[in-house]
Amino acid sequence: MHERYVPADVEAAAQGDWRAADAYKTKEDSQKPKFYCVSMLPYPSGKLHMGHVRNYTINDVMYRYLRMNGYNTLMPMGWDAFGMPAENAAMANGVPPAKWTYDNIDYMKGQMQSMGLAIDWSREIATCKPDYYKWNQWLFLKMLEKGIAYKKTGTVNWDPVDQTVLANEQVIDGRGWRSGALVEKREIPMYYLRITQYADELLNDLDGLGWPERVKIMQQNWIGKSFGVNFGFPYELDGEKALLRVFTTRADTIMGVTFCAIAAEHPLATRLAQGKPELQAFIDECKRGGVAEADVATMEKKGIATGFSVTHPLTGEAVEVWIGNYVLMSYGEGAVMGVPGHDERDFAFAKKYGLPIKQVIAAEGQTYSLDAWQEWYGDKDAAVCVNSGKYDGLRYTEAVDAVAADLKAGGFGDKQVTWRLRDWGVSRQRYWGTPIPIIHCPSCGDVPVPEQDLPVVLPEDLVPDGTGNPLAKSEAFLNCTCPKCGAAAKRETDTMDTFVDSSWYFSRYTAPDADTMVDARTDYWMPMDQYIGGIEHAILHLLYSRFWTKVMRDLGLVKFGEPAKNLLTQGMVLNETYYREDATGKKTWYNPADVTVTHDDKGRPVGATLNADGQPVVLGGIEKMSKSKNNGVDPQVLIDQYGADTARLFTMFAAPPEQQLEWSGAGVEGASRFLRRVWSFGAGNREALAARAGFDAASLGDADKALRREIYSVLKQADFDYQRLQYNTVVSAAMKMLNAIDGAKGATPGVLRETYGVLLRVLYPVVPHVTFELWKALGYADEFGPLLDAPWPKVDEAALEQAEIELVLQVNGKVRGALKVAKDATREAIEVAAVADEAFAKFSDGKPAKKIVVVPGRLVNIVV
């Protein structure tokens, strides 16, 4: 072995051995407990970033530790390969999305392999491959048969210049990102999945999951189970009687209704706008806004009076109807009751347009004022009804019950449970996605593609130009025959939401070569024992994958109803930011590698200059690594300079997995320095370590006993920390071990070999290359087998036994020294030793002991 640690040589040698042995290819084994750990599959954007490195290293550490502990472990990998970024890159570069995607996959796969990850590449999938998305199509058709998938009109963002549908993120300040045209809302037919059918189960099953509480709460809020009242305001229009239906969780405030607001797309709005250009113009303006709920929440609230009124169902009073841009047709009934006295949004709307505000609940000790909104106005818990006739004095629950009963008696409505969750619209008017397997026949209508004709293959040679869907222009794809009548027909050109692709890939990993969607192997591996990914996926991906799993279960494909038992949301990787700002306020961001920072005498940054010109740049603070802030660190540069093990060690040591990690060049250098020490000790003591000298534990000297006691004590803590996923303290434990071994004076070769072997095994899951090569070079592999499957070291409890223990010695309650006594010393022997100790003589001022307090195993206090 080399005297000097050369990461490139060490890692090439270790990876060569692993490839030759096909070390990570995994099969089902009923004789072992299984552990299936999955990192959320990446989008093949071009290069790995440090967030990827951290995620996959956490997974890899878990895999290796559990494999050493006798588990049948599996770590697969794949590519979430469909999606809009590929189309955008294709337009920018004039190449098909397929080429861009596959090139990126090749490069990123090479990066992963250079990290030494324990991935079973025989299970690799790419969601853009027909053998994968065939099963998206197959399950979609099964859902169509069961009524879980259905078609209805939905609202989309329409760019009138590019003649294309835009995703919410492509609408910038109400305009198309490419054309700059004002975006319109359009109603088009789309396919939906009835996720609402599973709302109760999705909510209730959260209780049994080992997921972060924060994620569970986010899902609970997204599902949004509400108990309230659904009722209608009666009206008559053109001789027809009807109800304007609303849902409210605050029926206790019904006597405070002073207006109703309806969505621009509401059928009543359409009727009222007939012959009224001003109303129609406002409706058109609303339709030009984005359809994202977040956009609606933050935009300026606008409205227009329709001149029409409905009737309050309990008072008989006229209630004005307004059209509001903040009311979404896709939520609730597309109409809301306006209670400005007790709803902050309604309060602002009423103040803006001079609408009446009526107080109908009061809280003791609080004074109501129309001058400004106060938090208690909307508090249902500390208030009672006022100015509400027969409901005066009632608290929230009593008032809701009474109002609901009266509405029901009048035929206007009743109590209802509603959900914030809406059915999942899966149609996307994009090219690079799973084709929806439907054929449009002029005679037969919408016809599902027969199962034997799946997959409907997406052409991979098209280049989007930003004007419409390329599939609609591809005659080879578009034209087909109707499976029912044989007439000329057209294929559906919409593709599926890419969240479909990521909703079940972890199940396909378990049976990647199956000629069915999944098989018996899936029930062996699933559900995942550990899922790892960012908190940003807490709602959509994780909710959709739970729904998809439950559908697969109900169709008899699998026996489980949840995809993941446990979830780890790793923290973000942060780094410093630096920028310059021009006269227009535009900021140019500079990478930390291109900046020199000056510090004060306490190490705090006080200034920075750009290396290229020596001129100052502004310190922007620590933020998440991102392209927009140009503060990322290229993992490949790091690996090339320091080696993969250093990158792995730093990302595991710098912070616990679930917390944010602040990047530190000094920390990386420290990790590299530690690995050089590990190697140097092995190389410098290779003769003693490789000699395989034995020893008799009973006859060891004090130095050997002390070293073994320290190593096994630290091992016990490291093992505990591995189990609770606190890998930063595992690394700390390994550092303690190395210090103890390196500093041991008088330890014999046999004990050095034993304790260094423990260190290598403790470090191996975190830094597999250097430990694997040292294990082999020093002969441990000949004794225990390759480090890949070497047994995890067991704590030698006998080594932890001490003949003597050390007690704190106090005089009059103050610590004055330490007292060594035999482990099994009697109370009397301890008292005698304490009084005889020089510390007592020094601090007792010659006075005799009046009382001696002994706390077994801890301290002795002599009172004089």
From Swiss-Prot:
Q: Which UniProt keywords apply?
A: Aminoacyl-tRNA synthetase, ATP-binding, Cytoplasm, Ligase, Nucleotide-binding, Protein biosynthesis
- What's the source species for this entry? Burkholderia vietnamiensis (strain G4 / LMG 22486) (Burkholderia cepacia (strain R1808))
Superkingdom is Bacteria
Query: What is a biological process (GO) this protein takes part in?
Result: leucyl-tRNA aminoacylation
Per UniProt, where does ATP bind?
K627
Report the InterPro entries cross-referenced here. aa-tRNA-synth_I_CS, aa-tRNA-synth_Ia, Leu-tRNA-ligase, Leu_tRNA-synth_edit, M/V/L/I-tRNA-synth_anticd-bd, Methionyl/Leucyl_tRNA_Synth, Rossmann-like_a/b/a_fold, tRNAsynth_Ia_anticodon-bd
- Motif 'HIGH' region — list its residue ranges: 42-52
Q: Which major enzyme category is it?
A: ligase
Q: Name one GO cellular component term.
A: cytosol
Q: Residue ranges for motif 'KMSKS' region? A: 624-628
The UniProt similarity line reads:
Belongs to the class-I aminoacyl-tRNA synthetase family.
Matching entries from HAMAP family are given as:
Leu_tRNA_synth_B
Localisation: Cytoplasm
Report the GO molecular function annotations: aminoacyl-tRNA deacylase activity; ATP binding; leucine-tRNA ligase activity
Q: What is its EC number?
A: 6.1.1.4
Reactions catalysed, semicolon-separated, are: tRNA(Leu) + L-leucine + ATP = L-leucyl-tRNA(Leu) + AMP + diphosphate
**Keyword Protein biosynthesis annotated:** yes
**Cross-referenced PANTHER family:** LEUCINE--TRNA LIGASE, MITOCHONDRIAL (PTHR43740:SF2), LEUCYL-TRNA SYNTHETASE (PTHR43740)
Pfam family name, one: Anticodon_1
PROSITE patterns per record: AA_TRNA_LIGASE_I
Keyword Ligase listed: yes
Q: Which gene encodes it?
A: leuS
> By what name is this protein known?
Leucine--tRNA ligase
